[in-house]
């Protein structure tokens, strides 16, 4: 199930805020979530939305903190809810400025999966050629290759 809001930001840009997105346990890992996101990206680009936004949650039944950046959502390190995790990131990845900087390598993804935390206001940039779109395309290609 999912809930979304269509909004306009302070600069007059249209965006979609994804409030919630939950899948049943039997649906996770099937590719359904990435397919739903791919469809939302295509629809939003066609309707001239500037970006998608969500709070990428971490909890007993929530893995958005990892899944959404893996598929292209990004945020500055200051958007990580936990100050102690922000400090650990700066120590482990001193060159990193955003969550996607951490997620750019397998080592970073592995570290984030264990140590990562809730991200406030993560954004998926819908502009052609954006890092979000490039990351999403690479993720989808990796899924196809894995089978």
Question: What do the predicted segments below correspond to?
Answer:
Residues 2-4, 12-26:
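Conserved acetyl-CoA binding element of GNAT-fold acetyltransferases
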Residues 21, 35-39, 53-55:
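General structural concept
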Residues 24-28, 32, 54-60:
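Conserved aromatic-histidine-acidic binding/catalytic patches
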Residues 28-44:
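Conserved acetyl-CoA-binding loop-helix of GNAT-fold acetyltransferases
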Residues 42-60, 67:
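Conserved GNAT acetyl-CoA-binding A-motif
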Residues 57-80:
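Conserved active-site alpha-helix within GNAT-family acetyltransferase domains
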Residues 79-147:
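Intrinsically disordered, low-complexity, charge-dense segments enriched in Lys/Arg
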């Amino acid at each position: 199930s999912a809930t979304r809001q269509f909004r306009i930001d302070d600069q007059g840009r249209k965006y979609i805020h994804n409030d919630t997105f939950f899948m049943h346990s039997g649906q996770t890992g099937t590719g359904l979530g990435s397919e739903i996101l791919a469809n939302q990206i295509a629809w939003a680009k066609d309707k001239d939305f500037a970006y998608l936004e969500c709070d990428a949650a971490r909890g007993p039944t929530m893995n958005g903190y990892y899944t959404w950046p893996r598929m292209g959502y990004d945020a500055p390190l200051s958007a990580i809810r936990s100050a102690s995790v922000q400090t650990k990131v700066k120590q482990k990845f001193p060159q990193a400025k955003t969550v996607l900087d951490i997620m750019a390598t397998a080592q970073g993804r592995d570290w984030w999966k264990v140590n990562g935390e809730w991200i406030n206001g993560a954004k998926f940039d819908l502009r052609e050629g954006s890092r979000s779109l490039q990351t999403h395309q690479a993720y989808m290609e990796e899924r196809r290759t894995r089978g």
